[in-house]
Amino acid sequence: GLSSQQQTDFANAFIHPIRNSDNTLHFLVIQKDGTVTICDSAGTVKSLTNNGSSYLSGLTNPSTELTATTVADFTFLVNKTKTVAQSTNASPTRNPEALVHVAKSDYSVTYTLSITKGGQTYTREISTMASVQDSTADSADAEKSIQTDRIASNLRYNTTTETAYYGTTSGASIPGINFALYGNVIHIYGSSSNDDFTLEATDSRGGEHLRVFKGETPDFKKLPTQSPENFVIKVSGDNTKGQDDFYVKFNTNVTNGRPVWKETIKSGIRTTIDPSTMPHTLTYDGSAYTLGTQAYDDRLVGDDITNSFPSFIGEKINDVFFHRNRLGFLADENVIFSEAGEYFNFFSKTVVTLVDSAPIDVAVSNNQVSILRHAVPFNESLLLFSDFSQFRLSAEQLLTPETVSIDVTTRFEASLVAKPKGAGKYVYFPTKKGAFSGLREYFVDISTETNDASEITAHIPSYIAGTVKSMAASSNEDMVCLITDDDATVVYPYKFFYKGNDKLQSAWSQWKFSGSVRFMEFDQSDLFFVTQYGDKVALERMNFSRDDALSDTSFPVLLDRRVKLTGNDTLPYTDATAIYVTTAGAIVTASAAATFQAGGGTVYAGVPYTLIYRFSQQVFRNQKQPITTGRLQLKNMAVVYANTGFFNVVTVPHKNLPVASRTTYTRAFTGRVVGGGTNILGTVPLDTGTYRFGLQANAQNAQIELQSASHLPCSFQSAEVEAEFVLRSQRM
């Protein structure tokens, strides 16, 4: 049916809605100069510690340059004009170094270690004794000569031969190169970063006894069990297993007392995302807010190939969202997800294997550039919007790097200043045609399993002027509302009614405000507006369910910017058109209202607004099409109303005449029907019935409107018309 809409309740202002874990609704306001204000739904300003001023600097149009999403008590705030960067933090670097592991030993083996530095090669060589000796003492010495730690000790340069070593040794010292011994492992390292070297280790058993580790090794299993702390080496991945290269470092700081080789990051590469360029977080502790930078996890393993920085580095983030327990960003043509359950980590924790929880970084595949603007959860997947295409990001039961996929679903041009909104099983997004806007309704056709987006403004191509800059949608109220940049005082609501998969009714209309609507958002059956009146900003609420005034009255009090006044309360704004209504339904002056309040009474004050419904031109038609070969003369019309206190029927028989020459007829319905059961003195009559009125006008020329500027409700269920159709001619 057609009903006069509920009034807005006056409060004080804002922009992004925050639904906290305690189910309180607050609003975040960020002004052009970076000023941040947070208020609750009653307009009370909340305490805020703002440490994010630099991130909000340089704003010119916060409504389009900022975006945010809230989960529990965390709100992620994105400045779309900021380019995300790496910080200068890097993994530790070490001087050139290597390990020589005496893995085996035997009798009569020669071990040779050659080190080249500065173009000169230095060689040191030792030999173990033979197993067969002339005496028992010599045999004991021979056994000592094959001890691996003794061999390692005597292969070192810049040291004298170990006392009582029973083999033979020879070799020279090397400037700028140092040696340390860890059991049967020699640690060779330069005195500075410039003291690099190469080395070769051989033995007379075909290389089975000596192993060298410098820079890279092909076999992780052959790494020694002893090493200096934090020695880093690259392990070549096994291509047959699809394994990437990875890095390990020696770690002696373990709880079980056994040192291990632990996966790590390549030395000397960047590790950190600059938090000052990343989305900031607004946190709520139950009483106050804190806005500031968020520490995102460092890269701890791999290198720039195996574990690269996320693709939003060097780009601007266009949207932020949550999907399947991951924090997500849109940047350029990429969708970037955090690690599952770890919202601040965008690096893999291991590159040895690809785990299901690892971060995801995937680009859309399209034959044209598709900069992703918005992401909207839809039908267990994620709907992605670019200017010319729509994509569906989906996965199997789990969203993982291996199961994620992005497919083009539809190719419709979109006007994406306003973020698309979902309502039920539909997603609505704006389009632009010249100076006017339209709206498409995205859905999945269950019968054909195809995606489509119907243009629900095809019949009103010139109705919505300008570019849509803000949207609000509600599945509770089956409604989508639009604001454009053409006239900020106008809101375009689209009301629809579905039964199953069939849309039985839908209608567009306009709400004209006395102030400029800057923002709107649904909260269940409440629609909140941030409205500017001159230099004042108000947070206003439109309630689509039960009117709050019914707690004091027997009728809804339909006034815009309505407030409840008791005691010494006064109207909190100035408007010469404001009226005062007592709980008995009487309209009184401001002074009379003050007297009534002083006596303990309650008064509702606000600004009257006008409901206008204009009937479409009446057309005579058969089952297939309109019949235009005759004259349709309107005789009478009947309007079925319910719980209605007042309305006017305004008819203009000749709408095509100049305004000064038109005749306008106005008929008033007051709700007081003689003999009616609701016509009781001292009460507000709300009647239900049928109102009939005459027309006597040509359907092509007649303009028929239902109007009401009363604070009393009116609701129209249906209408019927009596007419006479006269054909101009008949077939012979």
Please name every model-derived segment.
Residues 1-44, 219-319, 323-371, 434-451, ...:
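N-terminal beta-propeller domains
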Residues 2-5, 295-325, 331-477, 486-488, ...:
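Beta-propeller and closely related beta-pinwheel folds
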Residues 2-7, 11-19, 23, 437-732:
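Beta-sheet repeat architectures centered on beta-propellers
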Residues 28-30, 77, 328-329, 382-385, ...:
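Conserved beta-strand element within WD40/beta-propeller blades
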Residues 41-46, 54-57, 61-108, 182-205:
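Hydrophobic or amphipathic alpha-helical targeting/insertion segments
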Residues 86-97, 398-414, 609-626:
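A short, polar beta-strand/turn micro-motif
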